[in-house]
Amino acid sequence: MRLVLLGPPGSGKGTQATRLKDTFDIPHISTGDLLRAEVAAGSPLGLKAKEVMARGDLVSDDILLGMLEARLGQADVAKGFILDGYPRNVAQANALDELLGKIGQPLDAVVQLDVASELLVERIAGRAKAEGREDDNPESVRKRLQVYTDSTAPVIGFYEQRGKLARVDGVGSLDEVLERISKALGR
C-alpha cells in the first residue's frame, strides 16, 4: 500500500498516519521528520536545508524531493509507505508522481481528511493549550488554514482527476476515522 494522507492542519493526519503505520505495517514518512533528521545528521541535503531555514526561507522542492527520493530507496518501503506532509502543491504532486514512476512504485491511493474550518481552529487551540504552543493562536491557525486552502487544496483536484482520491470524514473518534480510512482503501 503506497498512500498519501492529505488534510488541513489539525485534521489528524499525523495521528492517523501513525495508526495506519501500525495497521498496515508500513513506514510513515513525514517530510518534516525527514528534514529534521537530515539537518541533525549533517548530510549534504541537510546542510543545504539548514542554510535555507536559517534565512527564514522555505526549503525548496528540489531539496525535499531529494530527501524523499533517498528515503523511498530504503528497504523498509518495499511493501509500501504512508506519506504525510507532501505534496503540498501541484508542482510537488507532479514531481512525486514522476519520482514514483521512476522507481516503479506508483501511488495506490490518496486520502483527504475533511474537517470543518471552525472545528480545526478549536482542535488546534486545544492542542496549543495542552502543549503550551503559543504559535497556535486562532489568528495564526486561520492563516495556516488559508495557506492550505490556497496551496495544498489544488492537490486534491490533481489526484481526483487521476482517480486516486478518497475523501474521508475526519470528525469522530480516532477509531471511527481509522475505520473510515480503511473502508475507503478497501481494507
From Swiss-Prot:
<feature type="binding site">
    <location>
        <position position="92"/>
    </location>
    <ligand>
        <name>AMP</name>
    </ligand>
</feature>
<dbReference type="GO" id="GO:0004017">
    <property type="term" value="F:adenylate kinase activity"/>
</dbReference>
<keyword id="KW-0067">ATP-binding</keyword>
<feature type="region of interest" description="LID">
    <location>
        <begin position="126"/>
        <end position="136"/>
    </location>
</feature>
<dbReference type="GO" id="GO:0005524">
    <property type="term" value="F:ATP binding"/>
</dbReference>
<feature type="binding site">
    <location>
        <position position="133"/>
    </location>
    <ligand>
        <name>AMP</name>
    </ligand>
</feature>
<feature type="binding site">
    <location>
        <position position="31"/>
    </location>
    <ligand>
        <name>AMP</name>
    </ligand>
</feature>
<keyword id="KW-0418">Kinase</keyword>
<dbReference type="InterPro" id="IPR027417">
    <property type="entry name" value="P-loop_NTPase"/>
</dbReference>
<feature type="binding site">
    <location>
        <position position="36"/>
    </location>
    <ligand>
        <name>AMP</name>
    </ligand>
</feature>
<feature type="binding site">
    <location>
        <begin position="85"/>
        <end position="88"/>
    </location>
    <ligand>
        <name>AMP</name>
    </ligand>
</feature>
<keyword id="KW-0545">Nucleotide biosynthesis</keyword>
<dbReference type="GO" id="GO:0005737">
    <property type="term" value="C:cytoplasm"/>
</dbReference>
<feature type="binding site">
    <location>
        <begin position="10"/>
        <end position="15"/>
    </location>
    <ligand>
        <name>ATP</name>
    </ligand>
</feature>
<dbReference type="Pfam" id="PF00406">
    <property type="entry name" value="ADK"/>
</dbReference>
<feature type="binding site">
    <location>
        <position position="144"/>
    </location>
    <ligand>
        <name>AMP</name>
    </ligand>
</feature>
<keyword id="KW-0808">Transferase</keyword>
<protein>
    <recommendedName>
        <fullName>Adenylate kinase</fullName>
        <ecNumber>2.7.4.3</ecNumber>
    </recommendedName>
</protein>
<feature type="region of interest" description="NMP">
    <location>
        <begin position="30"/>
        <end position="59"/>
    </location>
</feature>
<comment type="function">
    <text>Catalyzes the reversible transfer of the terminal phosphate group between ATP and AMP. Plays an important role in cellular energy homeostasis and in adenine nucleotide metabolism.</text>
</comment>
<keyword id="KW-0547">Nucleotide-binding</keyword>
<feature type="binding site">
    <location>
        <position position="172"/>
    </location>
    <ligand>
        <name>ATP</name>
    </ligand>
</feature>
<dbReference type="InterPro" id="IPR033690">
    <property type="entry name" value="Adenylat_kinase_CS"/>
</dbReference>
<feature type="binding site">
    <location>
        <position position="127"/>
    </location>
    <ligand>
        <name>ATP</name>
    </ligand>
</feature>
<dbReference type="GO" id="GO:0044209">
    <property type="term" value="P:AMP salvage"/>
</dbReference>
<comment type="pathway">
    <text>Purine metabolism; AMP biosynthesis via salvage pathway; AMP from ADP: step 1/1.</text>
</comment>
<comment type="similarity">
    <text>Belongs to the adenylate kinase family.</text>
</comment>
<keyword id="KW-0963">Cytoplasm</keyword>
<dbReference type="InterPro" id="IPR000850">
    <property type="entry name" value="Adenylat/UMP-CMP_kin"/>
</dbReference>
<comment type="subunit">
    <text>Monomer.</text>
</comment>
<feature type="binding site">
    <location>
        <begin position="57"/>
        <end position="59"/>
    </location>
    <ligand>
        <name>AMP</name>
    </ligand>
</feature>
